[in-house]
Design a protein with these regions (language model features):
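Short hydrophobic targeting helices and cationic amphipathic motifs
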Residues: 7-8
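A domain-level signal for the mature, folded cores of soluble proteins
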Residues: 11-12
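Contiguous, well-folded functional domains in the mature portion of proteins
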Residues: 16-231
Length: 231
């Protein structure tokens, strides 16, 4: 079978469902288009290209893309850290910024900025970091610079979301990047935010900036790999 060597995508597909993962609802259409296009190309390769040393490897690549697309837009089952005064990471990724900054847009005061960079292989779904009330939401059009650059926080397309509970208020931003040009956000001022529930997704990676009170006890350091809901 020409596709026998391409068992990895199907393994990823099976693992996605076997480990209580689901597919993000806003990505189903994207996955379907990937499968339609890749499936069509595989058919054309196997039907009309007579050289197996060309058609088989290329078909294998497209099968891998089909399988990986399902794994790529997965929604993992996470054990949420409890405590209304405990802020968890909005996204999976690497800590790239921990510094004191002035947040002028909504909080209007000095905060601790903690930024999480999501690469191509991280889970792309975002989760509410605390339970409380959504107090602020704004979409900012912008550029698509590399997300790990410091100036990307202000210049790139992003959304800003504020949440408040009895312990205080925080703000976080979903930043688009060079490849991640599709931000989905479910925030709506006045609505409840529940820690661990989905608050959106940034397709194809990018970055999250979180703005925390100066007296927050930061439990991570630069270079740490974090998981949404659990870190």
């Amino acid at each position: 079978c020409p596709l026998r060597s391409c068992h990895l995508p199907f393994t990823l597909f099976i693992r996605t469902f076997a480990t209580a993962m689901t597919i993000h609802k806003d990505c189903i259409k994207t996955i379907l288009w990937i499968w339609i296009i890749a499936g069509g190309l595989i058919y054309l390769l196997l039907r009309f290209v007579p050289w197996s040393f060309v058609s088989y490897p290329l078909s294998a690549i497209f099968v891998f893309i089909m399988g990986f697309s399902v794994f790529f837009f997965r929604v993992p089952d996470r054990k949420v850290v409890k405590g209304d005064n405990v802020v968890t990471s909005v996204a999976d990724g690497e800590i790239v910024v921990i510094e004191k900054v002035f947040e002028p847009e909504h909080l209007g005061k000095e905060c601790i900025q903690v930024s999480v960079y999501m690469d191509f292989f991280n889970v792309h779904v975002n989760f509410w970091p605390i339970t409380g009330e959504c107090t602020y939401y704004k979409y900012h059009p912008g550029k698509y610079l590399l997300a790990f650059l410091p100036k990307a926080s202000e210049l790139n397309e992003h959304t800003s979301i504020g949440i408040r509970n009895e312990y205080g208020e925080i703000l976080f931003k979903q930043l688009a990047g060079t490849f991640a040009r599709r931000i989905v956000c479910y925030a709506e001022p006045g609505k409840a935010a529940v820690k661990g529930n989905q608050c959106g997704i940034i397709k194809f990676g990018s970055r999250i900036d979180m703005y925390l009170p100066l007296d927050a006890d930061i439990k991570v350091k630069l270079g740490d790999c974090v998981k949404a809901c659990e870190t």
